């Protein structure tokens, strides 16, 4: 967003308020083992800052974080950022036609307020009775405790979403036993990941147009999925093929029919985001893994309890319970013309014009706003489109 504004007006008076100590957002914070992107590297980069050095078809957390830091530095973003500064409140002042912004480091005023807090900024922890009594170690995957050695530990993992599908295969060989709590099974497809040869990276550096063509080809391929997912004439043929492929993977990688049945979703494929992994099923079929088809209902001093009342002794609880993309915490702190917060106006059902602007909140723009996420391609494309719209407004 800021890079777009500065390209249009290099002298623009722009200040970024960032509660973290560095740029990078989710790729700065999520450092769990195996953290990587499920979108091809060819698309997971800005069009104005192509990266020829990706070492894998799907970038790792370390690669993406380094890329974002470099882009921020080169685009003049870092020097316009106030780090370690958390938003407390933002109120529209109609008399002055300005936003009055209160932060942990003082008050600011602005003609325009852009909420670019993202959808994956605040981890969600389930409200489970007894957690306060648990004597072991517990943490959310987005706040991974690297000081806690999992070697020989009995671990409970809560959740089987996009984070767990990456970190569980990375820790399963280290732990003594892993108990996986799965509330809802997900459709899983192979991840077309592979190394990118140094000769290819060199080719991209020497001939950027080739990389641009590859990017366009990958984008077009991803867009074809939309046709198969949304157009009635295509859904009739495409969705059964998608599901057949997913069931084939499940059948080959999970030999136990009872476990395979529990890992088979009870909803049509594409109703939720499809997870991509080559090592998820092999990991959770290990002898030291138990899959519990239940939510975590309570905790004790030495373990966790499922819905049937069964207790599992564990030393460590890892929450892979995701975030609250439909209820961004920033919505509680931004107040419009009538003094009501975004959260109050939305009342549990977020909506915005083009996912960007909300009636009653003048000169407020949302990045990654309601209903702008994707289930098939790169959010980077959406963010650039939103940034261009806001810059023209």
Label each region the model flagged:
Residues 1-22, 108, 115-255, 289-290, ...:
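Rossmann-like dinucleotide-binding core of oxidoreductases
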Residues 1-81, 182-183, 252-258:
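Beta1-alpha1 glycine-rich phosphate/pyrophosphate-binding loop at the start
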Residues 17, 87, 107-120, 155-158, ...:
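Short hydrophobic core segments
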Residues 51-70, 82, 233-242, 267-279:
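Short beta-strand to alpha-helix junction loop
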Residues 55-121, 246, 253:
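Feature captures the FAD/FMN-dependent oxidoreductase FAD-binding
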Residues 82-98, 147, 287-307:
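A conserved short coil-to-beta-strand element within the FAD-binding core of flavoproteins
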Residues 240-313:
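Alpha/beta-hydrolase fold catalytic core
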Residues 320-391:
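Glycine/threonine-rich phosphate-binding loop and adjacent beta-strand/alpha-helix elements that clamp
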């Amino acid at each position: 967003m800021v890079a777009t504004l500065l390209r249009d007006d290099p002298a623009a008076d722009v200040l970024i308020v960032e509660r973290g100590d560095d740029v990078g957002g989710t790729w700065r914070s999520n450092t769990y083992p195996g953290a990587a992107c499920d979108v091809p590297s060819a698309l997971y980069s800005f069009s104005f800052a192509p990266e020829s050095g990706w070492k894998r078809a799907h970038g790792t957390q370390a690669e993406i974080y380094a890329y974002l830091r470099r882009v921020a530095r080169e685009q003049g973003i870092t020097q316009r950022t106030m780090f370690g500064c958390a938003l407390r409140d933002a109120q529209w002042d109609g008399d002055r036609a300005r936003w009055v912004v209160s932060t942990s480091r003082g008050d600011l005023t602005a003609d325009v307020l852009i909420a670019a807090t993202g959808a994956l900024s605040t981890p969600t922890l389930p409200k489970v009775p007894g957690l306060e009594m648990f004597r072991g170690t517990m943490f959310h995957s987005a706040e991974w405790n690297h000081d806690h050695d999992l070697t020989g530990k009995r671990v409970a993992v809560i959740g089987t979403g996009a984070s767990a599908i990456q970190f569980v295969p990375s820790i399963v060989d280290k732990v003594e036993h892993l108990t996986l709590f799965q509330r809802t099974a997900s459709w899983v497809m192979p991840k077309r990941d592979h190394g990118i040869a140094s000769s290819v990276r060199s080719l991209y550096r020497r001939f950027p147009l080739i990389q641009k063509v590859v990017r366009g080809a990958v984008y077009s391929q991803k867009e074809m999925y939309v046709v198969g997912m949304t157009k009635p004439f295509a859904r009739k043929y495409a969705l059964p093929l998608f599901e057949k492929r997913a069931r084939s993977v499940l059948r080959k990688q999970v030999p136990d029919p009872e476990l395979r049945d529990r890992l088979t979703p009870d909803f049509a494929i594409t109703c939720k985001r499809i997870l991509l992994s080559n090592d998820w099923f092999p990991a959770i079929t290990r002898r030291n893994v138990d899959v519990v088809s239940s939510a975590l209902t309570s905790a004790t001093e030495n373990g966790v309890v499922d819905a049937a009342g069964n207790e599992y002794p564990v030393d460590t609880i890892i929450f892979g319970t995701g975030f609250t993309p439909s209820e961004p915490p920033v919505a509680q702190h931004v107040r419009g013309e009538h003094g009501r917060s975004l959260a109050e106006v939305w009342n549990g059902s977020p909506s915005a014009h083009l996912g960007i602007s909300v009636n009653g909140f003048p000169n407020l723009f949302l990045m990654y706003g309601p209903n702008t996420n994707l289930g098939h391609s790169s959010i980077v494309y959406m963010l650039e489109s939103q940034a261009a719209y806001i810059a023209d407004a």
